[in-house]
């Protein structure tokens, strides 16, 4: 299966997408396009099969964010000015259940890293944050994300990945 990852387009078929998590399904179906085109508060990228170029297999959404410097472990902010850190928020990431276990999650997060590097080079940002569901913390950790202190005890875990780690992993200067 040849997969292409690109920005969400209005004619993309999102109604049948089902990752097993209704808030993630609803976001893609009801909000992703408007947030991208009308509100400019996030951009959604979709994985599609080249043979079925409108069927969404998975997606991620990126937005800008800033977080107070004191939310980070000292090793990540040593030597930085006392400002909030500019970041990219990995706001959503989901794979349709029909395509789970085929490496799409890896492909999606890898593309998110590539987009983040381009943004960092163009406007500057320190890293990526994600609010990982409790059952997905280990998955994000495998990519180098670390938990930030002060997260909600019952909600998602706020996690951080330094842009330098992404550069090293992708072997970019």
Regions found by a protein language model. Give the residues of each.
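Conserved beta-hairpin
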Residues: 40-64, 71
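Conserved acetyl-CoA-binding loop-helix of GNAT-fold acetyltransferases
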Residues: 101-115
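Conserved active-site tyrosine of GNAT-family acetyltransferases
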Residues: 130, 140-141, 145
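Short coil/loop residues immediately preceding or within conserved phosphate-binding loops
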Residues: 42, 85, 125-127
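C-terminal "cap" of GNAT-fold acetyltransferases
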Residues: 124-135, 149-173
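Alpha-helix termini
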Residues: 35-38, 117-123
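Conserved acyl-donor/pantetheine-binding loop and adjacent beta-alpha core of acyl/acetyltransferases
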Residues: 59-92, 100
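Short amphipathic alpha-helix that is part of the acyltransferase structural core
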Residues: 1-38
């Amino acid at each position: 299966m040849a997969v292409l990852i690109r920005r969400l387009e209005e004619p993309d078929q999102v109604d049948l997408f089902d990752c097993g998590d209704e808030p993630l399904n609803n976001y893609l179906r009801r909000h992703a396009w408007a947030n991208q085109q009308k509100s400019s508060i996030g951009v959604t990228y979709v994985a599609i099969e080249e043979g079925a170029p409108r069927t969404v297999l998975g997606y991620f959404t990126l937005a800008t964010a800033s977080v107070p410097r004191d939310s980070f472990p000292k090793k990540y902010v040593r030597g930085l000015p006392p400002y909030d850190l500019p970041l990219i928020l990995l706001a959503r990431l989901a794979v349709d259940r029909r395509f789970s276990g085929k490496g799409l999650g890896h492909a999606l997060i890898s593309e998110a890293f590539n987009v983040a590097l381009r943004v960092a080079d163009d406007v500057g940002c320190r890293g990526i944050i994600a609010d990982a569901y409790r059952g997905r913390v280990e998955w994000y950790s495998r990519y180098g994300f670390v938990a930030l202190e002060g997260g909600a005890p019952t909600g998602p875990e706020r996690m951080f990945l330094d842009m330098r780690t992404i550069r090293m992993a992708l072997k970019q200067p």
